[in-house]
Amino acid sequence: MPIQKPCAFINARSGSTSDITEPLTAKLKAKFESIGPVKYVEPAKMSEMISATIEDGCDLVIIYGGDGSALSAAKLATEKNVPIVALPGGTMNLLPKTLYDTVEWEEALDTALACETPRWMAAGDVNGNTFLCGCIIGTPTRLNEVREQIRDKHFKEATEDLIFNVMNFKSEDVFEYALGSSPDTYHEANLLNVICPQMSDFDTGPGGLEVNALDVDSIFDVAGLGLSAIASDWRENDHAETNISNELHVKGSGKIDILLDGEPTPMTLPLNLILIKKGVLVLAPN
């Protein structure tokens, strides 16, 4: 069934967004008889507003922000079988690049709206938490908070956290992981990079999660860690081991640091990661 009533939200705090409410509204009104809200909003209010517009009958959620913003919108929309359009307004924009092959929001929107029907896209899940691009597991992910503080010009806090992480990083802080639904062999690593099929340039066959396990020797080896790590070719690293699997288990107890689509999301071990073939509805070409 064709889209009848789209709505759009612009994350005011994403890496490269600006207030495009006027041109975005004009483009939507030129194509649809009825549209929902087109709002430039603070992140704290976005989830509530998206839920309200879906309840009000909007059947497409357009999100202009980063990959984390797209993830938040996708989780709310997919629960109601409503597709999303992820416009590139963040730092990395991995999802829009993959779906629409552009970093220009107007081109991405035109490509999306030219599609007649939405389609399912695979996603990953770790302990009930969805990710659309990738999941990075291990203590070195704490440096992502330093990166965000620098981007927000919180230099004092960033310096303090960097010193703390350098002083407390231990390369021997390893955990055990295993592949498959009934694992009998566990391996050791202190950093795992799990990439969704659509983000991987590796041959995943019929579709699977790309799992890169690394033994990071020094915190300086991951000084630039963030969402960009999902796009990096970690397979060239001498300490990396790459596998494809629909399921991954991580042993242990206590807290562990995780990045989901670039967003810090600490969790409690053990972890169970699975591929969800129908993970999120998107309005995008096949």
Residues covered by each model-derived region:
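Conserved Motif II region of HX4D acyltransferases
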Residues: 69, 123, 262
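Short, solvent-exposed amphipathic alpha-helical segments in soluble enzyme
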Residues: 23-26, 78-79, 148-149, 227-231, ...
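Short beta-strand/turn micro-motifs composed of small residues
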Residues: 10-12, 65, 215
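Structural motif
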Residues: 63-65, 87
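Domain-scale detector for complete catalytic domains at protein termini or as standalone homologs
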Residues: 56-58, 166, 279, 283
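ATP/nucleoside-binding phosphotransfer catalytic cores, i.e., glycine-rich phosphate-binding loops
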Residues: 206, 213-286
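Catalytic core of DAGKc-family lipid kinases
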Residues: 7-9, 13, 40, 79-85, ...
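ATP/NTP phosphate-donor binding region
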Residues: 1-61, 71, 75-79, 107-109, ...
